């Protein structure tokens, strides 16, 4: 059974979509589950001003992606990489074993997005 938070964000995610001319586009696919998330970021003076995602996967992956995008606003990429999957999991309000893969996947995705952005500069 999913928490109310997971169901609400799965049915009506706030940050699902793409950003035209995004400064960073990073994709991560979980080998364990096959879930895939594509993260789009727009930055202004090295701060994240917009974050959106496209995902194929479980309600947990959709929910975790939506939460992560929300948490990224206003942060630098360095600050974003310091965000932990635990912070996402706390908001999801699910038993740890049920959500771990989704939040860990997103933590790795933010690190990948940071690497891509640094290569572009």
Predicted regions and their residues:
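Domain-level signature for proteins that mediate thiol-based redox and metal-cofactor handling
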Residues: 1-121
């Amino acid at each position: 059974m999913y928490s109310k938070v997971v169901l609400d964000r799965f049915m009506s995610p706030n940050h699902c979509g793409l950003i035209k001319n995004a400064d960073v586009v990073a994709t991560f696919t979980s080998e364990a589950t096959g879930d895939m998330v594509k993260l789009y970021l727009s930055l202004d003076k090295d701060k994240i001003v917009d974050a959106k995602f496209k995902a194929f996967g479980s309600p947990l992956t959709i929910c975790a992606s939506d939460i992560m995008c929300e948490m990224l606003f206003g942060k630098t990429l360095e600050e974003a990489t310091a965000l932990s999957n635990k912070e996402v999991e706390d908001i999801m309000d699910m038993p740890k074993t049920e959500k771990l893969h989704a939040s860990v996947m997103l933590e790795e995705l933010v690190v990948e997005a940071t690497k891509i952005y640094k290569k572009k500069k």
